[in-house]
Amino acid sequence: MKRSMYAGRVREEHIGQEITLKGWVGRRRDLGGLIFIDLRDREGIMQLVINPEKVSAEVMATAESLRSEFVIEVTGQVAAREQANDKLPTGAVELNVTALIVLNTAKTTPFEIKDGIEANDDTRLRYRYLDLRRPEMLENLKLRAKVTHSIRNYLDELEFIDVETPFLSKSTPEGARDYLVPSRVNKGHFYALPQSPQITKQLLMNAGFDRYYQIVKCFRDEDLRGDRQPEFTQVDLETSFLTEQEIQDITEGLIARVMKETKGIEVTLPFPRVKYDDAMALYGSDKPDTRFDMLLQDLTEVVKGVDFKVFSEAPAVKAIVVKGAADNYSRKDIDKMTEVAKQYGAKGLAWVKVVDGELNGPVAKFLTGIQEELTTALALEDKDLVLFVADTLEVANATLGALRGRIAKELGLIDNDKFNFLWVVDWPMFEWSEEEGRYMSAHHPFTLPQEETAHELEGDLAKVRAIAYDIVLNGYELGGGSLRINQKDLQERMFKALGFSAEEANDQFGFLLEAMDYGFPPHGGLAIGLDRFVMLLAGEENIREVIAFPKNNKATDPMTQAPSTVALKQLEELSLQVEEDETSKTN
């Protein structure tokens, strides 16, 4: 029979109606001769009642054979429950079954289909089709669909044009490692899966599209963590003839629309703007979480005269004050934080506690002469814990920024119901890579430098500033963008500053440079990480929870066993040969 409605949508208004439902058996209970079934579909759970006095012996026998995750079809009359279940939207009603058909049986599942399961991640991914049956996973993906629907409607209203760009593109040397695709037709040549549609969307501006968007898959072969996947989705925008402020206004409007339509939250516009240098100085991060205080304090000048060379001779001394937390952290706890500090390059972590108006701790004796000044500078009160890092400014900022976030989580200082958006602006154009031993693009090599610093492209690259902007939500980089270079000579200077010879630049980006000979308009844009955005809206801590079929932290899929080996014939067609490593040879 035709399904009447979703099980999770049956309400009191349907009492007395005969309906047909289809779904999965969530739970079966036998009570006083009656059989109760929780029927589950994507919209929720509906209680079924099978009464032996009102159904045939065949229906009763079928009901007795039901097990969890059997797929069934039932017909019956909606009735009011004697005792309502306030925890379910369908809790005021039940279905008195008159007909029952088993559409398919099921083996015992490797974990219960319910929220809050204890299965490990690889088991969940191995049986992802079962994991996705769980209500919280269904809700996460329904939320994702609502977000993308809201985004499309908003951008369509603003006359953005949805244009698909190629997945088989050219490998470029900047950024993360590419996923390469060998060409069978062009032996020895490779496509790259795009890390973003950056250049193609810029070329669409040159083509006169004016406003482009795409919700697009991107690929990066990089180390994984909770908010990264090898393939991910971004909301990609590009515009012509707009200022950075206008692009940011459009983006804020998009986010405000999504927040209202999916969470019922009105966000305050415009979002705060924080300069990059200020974000690093105050929060120790270029993606600051502003839901709590504990700002970094610069004490370099305050401690200059102390008889403690670690402080007095350090390039920078910075501190954070953990208010009222002196009793929360033992010496052993602080030793653990010291190990965290060392991971960020710090040589150690100094600390004092305020006890009965006095400073206590390993370095307290060196600070007695400046206790009053220190107390004023840090607004110290009894029971405060102060953590110091004496090192380069970069190390001090990064270390205390990491500790700030860790401590806030440990002490429950973060209001998880808050959504604090902000812009980080006035970025450096380049960042020094210890691994590469050179300056690299902080964003990408197509970012427009601020006019007043562009002359440093041939001088001190550390002084070049970009017209770039990142949007941050609760300590996560939600997205980033910039105005782009549209003048050929400036783009060539940028490539040269990054160490490209003219030949290398032409080999890698000649098509873009050539396009700049044909009236390339001023343009700029932005990309938002859709997976990360939905993760934060859903209150999850890993983007796997909002992606239907993600990879694990080894970039593999336990369900399909991808990546896998392929037949020798396939490799030969591609003129490829796999070399065994030494480990394989000895095993």
Swiss-Prot record:
InterPro entries in alphabetical order: Aa-tRNA-synt_II (IPR004364), aa-tRNA-synth_II (IPR006195), aa-tRNA-synth_II/BPL/LPL (IPR045864), Asp-tRNA-ligase_1 (IPR004524), Asp-tRNA-ligase_1_N (IPR047089), Asp/Asn-tRNA-synth_IIb (IPR002312), AspRS_core (IPR047090), GAD-like_sf (IPR004115)
Name of the top EC class for this enzyme: ligase
Catalyzed reaction equations: tRNA(Asp) + L-aspartate + ATP = L-aspartyl-tRNA(Asp) + AMP + diphosphate
Subcellular location: Cytoplasm
One GO process term, biological-process aspect: aspartyl-tRNA aminoacylation
Primary location class: cytoplasm
Assigned EC number: 6.1.1.12
Residue sites binding L-aspartate per the record: 174, 220, 443, 484
Family per record: Belongs to the class-II aminoacyl-tRNA synthetase family. Type 1 subfamily.
Name this protein carries in UniProt: Aspartate--tRNA ligase
Organism name: Streptococcus pneumoniae (strain Taiwan19F-14)
